[in-house]
């Protein structure tokens, strides 16, 4: 077993060096860290193993990322752009979801297995979308707000649908009760946390450490309560972020976010989340598929349905071709939700190993390639503006 000093030296070296090296090639930081994870992980050079400590740190990184995503959502802009976000989310949910279900039927997965395919086709990756928008400084823009809000709405619905699929897969009969509990859970968080936070954060106005402690405290309360109901921790973390954001003034928001939480999250925990994602990815499955037709059908249809639905929705909303393209591409990446869905589907016997491997390949390709393409388009757009 490696010394933890050695492990953390390797991790910090990657986090510090690799993104700066690959930045010259317009490769986003999250992609470069994931690629590094694939190379050093057990399916690559086997330099590091993913142990329980790294898994815990990665899980906390995902929680921090989702909380910061919620905290970054400008609630006033969200209210102004809710209708537009809803249009994008409906296109991005229904078209790929229906397409995924039909392809599942074509592949002979049955009703529940096809529902699982619908979840996988419809799912976004809030983590990757938010990280790309953050890196490109687009979170606060109108396009960024619409895309992030729509991604969140879609992921909430797909997580709920995944929960329903799990209930059906294990023969559950309380799906309606679960959905009611989930709605109540989200409602209570959005109503209770803002008023509570205004009072408590006001008491600790000049005590920054205590403010951070309070934020972490409510995040974990929300997660623990959510787990009792059966709600994924990232949902609770995101809702907490939105609720806390509602309680803050702009100055408090910038101070809490930029001076404290961003440093904690992006300085350590969030990069570990992406590094571990790469380390746990067996890239060889892409090259070892016995049925290439299955991979091509799934990959081409999933990417095409997502991109087309996003492009059309943003065109309806009046954006130009470049922004439609960027927005359409940002609906494509799949990683956490799709891999969780695939893993659960295999455990429940809803899909076989061949389908599972295909979904892993889909997740790896979309999560790795999409950020690179988006950043290249964004840089090209900026260069064109500079020349003009």
From Swiss-Prot:
Q: Which domain of life is it from?
A: Archaea
Q: What is its main location?
A: membrane
Answer whether the UniProt record assigns the keyword Glycoprotein to this protein: no
The stretch of residues making up the signal peptide is none
Gene Ontology cellular component? Answer: plasma membrane
Give GO terms for biological process: proton transmembrane transport; sodium ion transport
Q: Write out the entry's keywords from A to Z.
A: Antiport, Cell membrane, Ion transport, Membrane, Sodium, Sodium transport, Transmembrane, Transmembrane helix, Transport
UniProt entry tagged with the keyword S-adenosyl-L-methionine = no
**Pfam annotation, one family:** Na_H_Exchanger
How is this protein positioned relative to the membrane? Multi-pass membrane protein
Residues crossing the lipid bilayer are 2-22, 27-47, 53-73, 81-101, 102-122, 146-166, 175-195, 215-235, 263-283, 294-314, 325-345, 354-374
GO MF terms, alphabetically ordered: antiporter activity
Location in the cell: Cell membrane
Query: What family does the Swiss-Prot or TrEMBL record give for this protein?
Result: Belongs to the monovalent cation:proton antiporter 1 (CPA1) transporter (TC 2.A.36) family.
What's its job? This is probably a Na(+)/H(+) antiporter.
Tell me the protein's name.
Probable Na(+)/H(+) antiporter 3
* Species of origin: Methanocaldococcus jannaschii (strain ATCC 43067 / DSM 2661 / JAL-1 / JCM 10045 / NBRC 100440)
């Amino acid at each position: 077993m490696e010394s933890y000093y050695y492990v953390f030296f390797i991790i910090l070296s990657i986090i510090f060096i690799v993104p700066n090296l690959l930045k010259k090639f317009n490769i986003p930081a999250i992609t470069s860290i994931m690629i590094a994870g694939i190379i050093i992980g057990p399916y690559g050079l086997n330099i590091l193993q993913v142990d329980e400590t790294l898994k815990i740190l990665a899980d906390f990184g995902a929680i921090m990322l989702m909380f910061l995503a919620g905290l970054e959502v400008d609630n006033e802009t969200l209210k102004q752009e809710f209708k537009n976000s809803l249009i994008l989310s409906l296109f991005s949910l229904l078209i790929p979801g229906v397409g995924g279900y039909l392809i599942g039927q074509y592949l002979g997965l049955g009703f529940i297995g096809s529902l699982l395919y619908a979840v996988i086709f419809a799912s976004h990756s809030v983590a990757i979308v938010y990280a790309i928008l953050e890196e490109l400084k687009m979170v606060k823009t109108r396009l960024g707000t619409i895309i992030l809000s729509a991604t969140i709405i879609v992921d909430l619905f797909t997580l709920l649908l995944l929960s329903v699929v799990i209930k059906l897969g294990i023969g559950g009969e309380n799906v309606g009760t679960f959905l009611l509990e989930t709605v109540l859970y989200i409602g209570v968080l959005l109503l209770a946390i803002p008023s509570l936070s205004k009072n408590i954060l006001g008491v600790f106005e000049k005590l920054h450490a205590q403010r951070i402690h309070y934020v972490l405290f409510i995040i974990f309360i929300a997660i623990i309560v959510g787990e009792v109901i059966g709600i994924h921790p990232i949902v609770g973390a995101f809702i907490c972020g939105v609720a806390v954001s509602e309680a803050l003034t702009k100055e408090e928001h910038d101070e809490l976010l930029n001076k404290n939480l961003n440093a904690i999250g992006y300085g350590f925990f969030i990069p570990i989340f992406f590094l571990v994602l790469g380390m746990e990815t067996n890239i060889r499955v892409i090259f070892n598929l016995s049925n290439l037709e299955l991979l091509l059908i799934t990959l081409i249809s999933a990417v095409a349905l997502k991109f087309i639905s996003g492009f059309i929705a943003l065109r309806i909303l009046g954006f130009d071709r470049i922004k439609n393209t960027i927005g359409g591409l940002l609906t494509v990446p799949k990683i956490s939700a799709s891999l969780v869905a695939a893993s659960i589907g295999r455990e429940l016997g809803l899909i076989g190993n061949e389908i599972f491997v295909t979904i892993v390949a889909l997740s790896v390709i979309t999560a790795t390639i999409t950020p690179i393409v988006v950043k290249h388009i964004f840089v090209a757009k900026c260069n064109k503006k500079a020349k003009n």
